[in-house]
């Protein structure tokens, strides 16, 4: 059942190493900042790995325009930044688990 490369002991060691790598990756993700854009870069929103908004930049030309449009652009820029953080998190976590010899069909929780 647990044959090959060290049996259960080897699997436990792999799991511990993976846990350490995941913790390091999560710490790195928390430090990340990404910027999402909308309106061809007229609105930019920067968020960190915890999805907290760090900065909002609005091109001065938009301040003369429709308030509803500006609100929509800010929301779209935030959503773009959140999508980028999510993609980065998935990439980092996938790289952590890439060396593990997992059973067929095993799904990681990320």
UniProtKB/Swiss-Prot annotation:
Subcellular location: Cytoplasm, Nucleoid
UniProt keyword terms in alphabetical order: Cytoplasm, DNA-binding
InterPro entries on file: YbaB-like_sf (IPR036894), YbaB/EbfC (IPR004401)
Domain of life: Bacteria
Record GO cellular component, one term: cytosol
Predominant location: cytoplasm
Function: Binds to DNA and alters its conformation. May be involved in regulation of gene expression, nucleoid organization and DNA protection.
Protein name, UniProt field: Nucleoid-associated protein Ent638_0951
Species in which this protein is naturally found: Enterobacter sp. (strain 638)
